[in-house]
């Protein structure tokens, strides 16, 4: 594949993912807007806390999408049609097992969440109501991890984009109807999410049987349960799960340390982190492209194209990070004012503008290497680099720097965490990615 053609392939895979990612905060904004016009501010808190529960829970299971993408892309590169199909079958089996686990443990999860979360009795009561309804979307959400991972591995990110847009549009419409027209409050928002997720799952199934039917093969138990394939599948996904848990815990640790600095500083940090997430929406698009292409060329045993893909991904990553850095550096107050109109927030955030500007160039390498490692199914390496970065760098740096430098110390520790992730994956790439297969 020529360089120009490879660039087109990267953009063809990246752009739909970026569009999909951009629709995510829109949904959250609409939910907050609907709750913000109810007769109590407790509704807003309930949506925020309820969303946190599901974000943590589903982030732990996000390994299913990553593992499915890597295995499927490698089978695609090797032109192994049977293994392409069985990558989906095995992932759906894991999704069903995870569904049984989540639904069986919903009582203990709700109890533990209510104990750990801080809020008034009214907020926690609404949060519990929201949780009890939205939990029934779990089967659809977990199966969609499998389907979206499979479609990306099959070098198609347009279908996941369509699924994401349709799901979010249906969710927004139903939430407006249930809340404004039917007066269902948080129950309406949660119910809209449940129905929308099943609409997304139905769409994924329709695409499977209309666009990819010729890739499907009859399910044979002996192949589905093949010992060596199953062992590798579980081993890789277990390592990806550990990595996901460590990442979720790292973000939660940052948030918890922010809360120790007081409500005002917590608000400042949560606003600044929104711009970390916004940048990640763009770089994750290229990371997903990396998953698909790196997996494909790994499966095809084509080291030349593999190296060229990684090189081009990082060029794109740099050219995405550069304008974000300039914009964050030149217009920090304007960006912050988009999120909050509280008069004290903008001046309080000014000492931390430097960290906002530093986010893009410091973090893009870690995001892109994630995609490369996932495509190569270098799960053990990505687990180890996350362990080194989270436990060996972020935790001690925070404990060392925060007592002396306060919020500056926390942000320095967080950026060191991201540097450690990017640097450790760079150092391990020769063995983990380029010489792995």
Language-model features: where?
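Small-residue-rich hydrophobic transmembrane alpha-helices
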Residues: 44-104, 141-160, 268-330, 364-377, ...
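Short alpha-helical transmembrane segments in multi-pass integral membrane proteins
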Residues: 1-14, 72-139, 181-241, 294-359, ...
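Helix-terminus/linker motif at the lipid-water interface of multi-pass membrane proteins
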Residues: 26-45, 114-121, 177-184, 245-278, ...
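Short runs within selected transmembrane alpha-helices of multi-pass transporters and secretion channels
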Residues: 62-65, 133-152, 160-171, 189-204, ...
């Amino acid at each position: 594949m020529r360089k120009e053609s490879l660039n087109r392939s990267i953009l063809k895979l990246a752009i739909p993912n970026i569009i999909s990612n951009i629709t995510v905060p829109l949904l959250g904004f609409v939910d907050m807007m609907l709750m913000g016009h109810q007769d109590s501010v407790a509704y807003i808190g309930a949506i925020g806390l309820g969303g946190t529960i599901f974000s943590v829970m589903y982030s732990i299971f996000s390994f299913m999408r990553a593992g499915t993408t890597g295995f499927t892309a490698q089978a695609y590169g090797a032109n192994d049609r049977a293994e392409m199909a069985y990558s989906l079958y095995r992932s759906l089996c894991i999704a069903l097992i995870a569904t049984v686990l989540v639904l069986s443990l919903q009582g203990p999860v709700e109890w533990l969440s209510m104990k750990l979360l801080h809020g008034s009795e009214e907020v926690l009561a609404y949060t519990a109501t929201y949780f009890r309804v939205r939990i029934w979307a779990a089967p659809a959400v977990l199966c969609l991890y499998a389907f979206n991972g499979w479609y990306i591995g099959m070098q198609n990110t347009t279908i996941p984009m369509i699924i994401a847009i349709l799901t979010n549009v249906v969710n927004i419409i139903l939430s407006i109807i249930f809340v404004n027209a039917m007066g269902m409050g948080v129950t309406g928002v949660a119910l809209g999410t449940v129905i929308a997720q099943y609409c997304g799952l139905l769409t994924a199934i329709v695409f499977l049987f209309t666009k990819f039917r010729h890739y499907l093969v009859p399910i044979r138990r002996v192949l589905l349960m093949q010992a060596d394939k199953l062992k590798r599948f579980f081993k890789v996904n277990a390592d990806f799960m550990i990595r996901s848990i460590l990442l979720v815990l790292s973000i939660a640790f940052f948030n918890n340390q922010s809360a120790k600095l007081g409500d005002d500083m917590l608000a400042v940090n949560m606003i600044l982190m929104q711009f970390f997430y916004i940048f990640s929406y763009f770089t994750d698009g290229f990371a997903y492209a990396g998953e698909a292409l790196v997996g494909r060329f790994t499966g095809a045993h084509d080291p030349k194209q593999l190296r060229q893909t990684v090189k081009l991904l990082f060029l794109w990553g740099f050219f995405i990070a550069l304008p974000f850095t300039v914009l964050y550096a030149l217009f920090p107050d304007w960006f912050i004012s988009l999120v909050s109109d509280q008069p004290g927030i903008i001046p309080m955030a000014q000492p931390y503008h430097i960290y906002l500007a530093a986010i893009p160039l410091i973090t893009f390498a870690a995001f892109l290497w994630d995609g490369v490692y996932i495509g190569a199914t270098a799960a053990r390496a990505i687990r180890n680099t996350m362990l080194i970065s989270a436990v060996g760098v972020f935790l001690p740096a925070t404990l060392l720097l925060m007592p002396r430098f306060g919020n500056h110390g926390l942000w320095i520790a967080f950026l060191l965490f991201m540097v450690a992730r990017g640097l450790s994956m760079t150092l391990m790439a020769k063995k983990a990615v380029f010489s792995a297969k």
